[in-house]
């Protein structure tokens, strides 16, 4: 009757485990030979769990813009360049970064708006024509400004494209390597003062920039203020004409290689151009620039992977930093244990100090206690009649696995334990302890040493028998000269008298010839 509750608990636990395995088997997905591609896609998209990748793919499949479905053709570079020109035209009049407000523009285009209320529209279906080009209007700060595609002329767009072609003939230098970026002269004094006042605001607004502002570029330039251009060439606007807008940094167009002749023929920047102090050129940067000019043929833009769009939607992959390992000693007096993990330290305190030996044996005649439950379960097998461990050689059964291991050594002849004193070998620890105890008792019992060789014996009679057998010449030497002083043997340092307290018996042959040398 006492064992029925334990049987019921084990049956319920086994049933719960079976139900849990059944539920988990329904959630498993077999990828077959596509496991490597699946894991590679999960790492590229930045997911940490396989379920997150599956949910993302399901959402993409059910949405209208699924990448697996046949969608519209990719945008031509001219369309993206047109969007960049619109954004740059806005940056010439306003230092704030425009953001995507949503659809609602003309012909179903997208509307971009900055914090100051300036807007311009652009759509994937809209393509730049000679009659459409961005032209900012110089309005006071209190009014709302908007740039639309209808307020431009074809001649201005042609000038912008020609200026863009001239500027893209020179490669852009890497970040903080070449000469500092330069700006165009402001169209007026009032506009120049406005740009100087908004320098600090531009740095604060960089964190709020959209994807167009921070997209990858071939020169890997910093997303600084919109007015700063990476091209080292300066140009002065003509009278009565708006300064031309250069190509945007986020355009995925290929950039030609940097040539050494373009670096040598470059004119020094004018005095009126403002340069940021943190990007000032140093001698080390000049050396890097010359090295870059020699290997400029390799500085070409790489094609953008196809999965960049999905990566941009879910954000960059988070890189986890390795946690610092700290040494945490146990604060209980007399312990001295040191751990590198807080979890291990708490486990040690709980089971070694706080709940020390909290698992007691239920047998009234035993009374043993243990720190861990698994040790108690192993101990409970000694009180039961269950013998689950069977020897494969003789079919003998045992209660514990350790007893089976020791018994198996009888069949294999293995004796892994050895005495350090005499080299005695045995199969189990108990036999070695019993053997070493004999060594300790024997050393304590040998109280009578031999004065000639130092060997020890348990009884004085054993010492006398040893002297008569091993040292007979040394025993007969002192008997020849009873009247004179005894002369010691050269091989003995200081022999004691024959009639010592060890109970040695005198020699029975006093007439034996002496072996001492004559003087």
Swiss-Prot record:
GO molecular function: DNA-binding transcription factor activity; DNA-binding transcription repressor activity, RNA polymerase II-specific; RNA polymerase II cis-regulatory region sequence-specific DNA binding; zinc ion binding
Main location: nucleus
Region described as Disordered: spans on this chain: 123-314, 469-519
Post-translational modifications reported in the UniProt record: Phosphorylation at Ser-470 results in loss of DNA-binding activity.
Pfam families attached to this UniProt entry: zf-C2H2
Modified residues (Phosphoserine): 162, 231, 470
A biological process from GO: regulation of gluconeogenesis
Resulting phenotype, residue 62 to A: Does not affect phosphorylation by AMPK
Alphabetized UniProt keyword annotations: DNA-binding, Metal-binding, Nucleus, Phosphoprotein, Repeat, Transcription, Transcription regulation, Zinc, Zinc-finger
Keyword Ion transport: no
Gene3D superfamilies: Classic Zinc Finger
An annotated GO cellular component: nucleolus
InterPro entries listed in its UniProt record: ZnF_C2H2-type_TF (IPR050888), Znf_C2H2_sf (IPR036236), Znf_C2H2_type (IPR013087)
Superkingdom to which the source organism belongs: Eukaryota
Zinc finger (C2H2-type): 328-353, 359-383, 389-411, 417-439, 448-471
Summary of the tissues where the protein is detected: Ubiquitous. Highly expressed in brain, thymus and spleen.
Biased composition (Pro residues): 177-187
Composition-biased stretches (Low complexity): 247-266
SUPFAM superfamilies tied to this protein: beta-beta-alpha zinc fingers
Family: Belongs to the krueppel C2H2-type zinc-finger protein family.
Free-text function comment from the UniProt entry: May act as an transcriptional repressor for PCK1 gene expression, in turn may participate in the hepatic gluconeogenesis regulation through the activated AMPK signaling pathway.
Name this protein carries in UniProt: Zinc finger protein 692
Gene: ZNF692
């Amino acid at each position: 009757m006492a064992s029925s509750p334990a049987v019921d608990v084990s049956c319920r636990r086994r049933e719960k485990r079976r139900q849990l395995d059944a539920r988990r088997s329904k959630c498993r997905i077999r990828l077959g030979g596509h496991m490597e591609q699946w894991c590679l896609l999960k790492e590229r998209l930045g997911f940490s769990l396989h379920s997150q990748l599956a949910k993302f793919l399901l959402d993409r499949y059910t949405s209208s813009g699924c990448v697996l479905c046949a969608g519209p053709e990719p945008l031509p570079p001219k369309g993206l360049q047109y969007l960049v020109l619109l954004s740059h035209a806005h940056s010439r009049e306003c230092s704030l970064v425009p953001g995507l407000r949503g659809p609602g523009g003309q012909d179903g285009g997208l509307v971009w708006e900055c914090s100051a209320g300036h807007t311009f529209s652009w759509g994937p279906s809209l393509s730049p024509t000679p009659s459409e080009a961005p032209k900012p209007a110089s309005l006071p700060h209190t009014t709302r400004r908007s740039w639309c595609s209808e307020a431009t002329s074809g001649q201005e767009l042609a000038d912008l494209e020609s200026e863009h072609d001239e500027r893209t003939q020179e490669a852009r230098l890497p970040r903080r390597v070449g000469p500092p970026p330069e700006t165009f002269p402001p169209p007026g004094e009032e506009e120049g003062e406005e740009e100087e006042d908004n320098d600090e605001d531009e740095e604060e607004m960089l964190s709020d920039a959209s994807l167009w502002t921070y997209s990858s570029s071939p020169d890997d330039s910093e997303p600084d203020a919109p007015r700063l251009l990476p091209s080292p060439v300066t140009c002065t606007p003509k009278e009565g004409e708006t300064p031309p807008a250069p190509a945007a940094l986020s355009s995925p167009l290929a950039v030609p290689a940097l040539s050494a002749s373009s670096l040598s023929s470059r004119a020094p920047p004018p005095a009126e151009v403002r340069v940021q102090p943190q990007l000032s050129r140093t001698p080390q940067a000049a050396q890097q620039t010359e090295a870059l000019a020699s290997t400029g043929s390799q500085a070409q833009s790489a094609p953008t992977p196809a999965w960049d769009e999905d990566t941009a939607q879910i954000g960059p992959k988070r890189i986890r930093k390795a946690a610092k390992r700290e040494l945490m000693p146990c604060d209980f007096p007399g312990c001295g244990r040191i751990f590198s993990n807080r979890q291990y330290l708490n486990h040690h305190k709980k089971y070694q100090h706080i709940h020390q030996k909290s698992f007691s044996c239920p047998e009234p005649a035993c009374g043993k206690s243990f720190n861990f439950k698994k040790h108690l379960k192993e101990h409970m097998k000694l009180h039961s009649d269950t013998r689950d461990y069977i020897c494969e050689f003789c079919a003998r059964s045992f209660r514990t696995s350790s007893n089976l291991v020791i018994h198996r050594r009888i069949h294999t002849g293995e004796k892994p334990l050895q005495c350090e004193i005499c080299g005695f070998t045995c199969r189990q620890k108990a036999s070695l302890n019993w053997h070493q105890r004999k060594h300790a008792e024997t050393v304590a019992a040998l109280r009578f040493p031999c004065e000639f060789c130092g060997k020890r014996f348990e009884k004085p009679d054993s010492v006398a028998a040893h002297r008569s057998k091993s040292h007979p010449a040394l025993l007969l030497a002192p008997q020849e000269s009873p009247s004179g002083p005894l002369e010691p043997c050269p091989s003995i340092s200081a022999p004691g008298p024959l009639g010592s307290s060890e109970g040695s018996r005198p020699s029975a042959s006093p007439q034996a010839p002496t072996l001492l040398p004559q003087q």
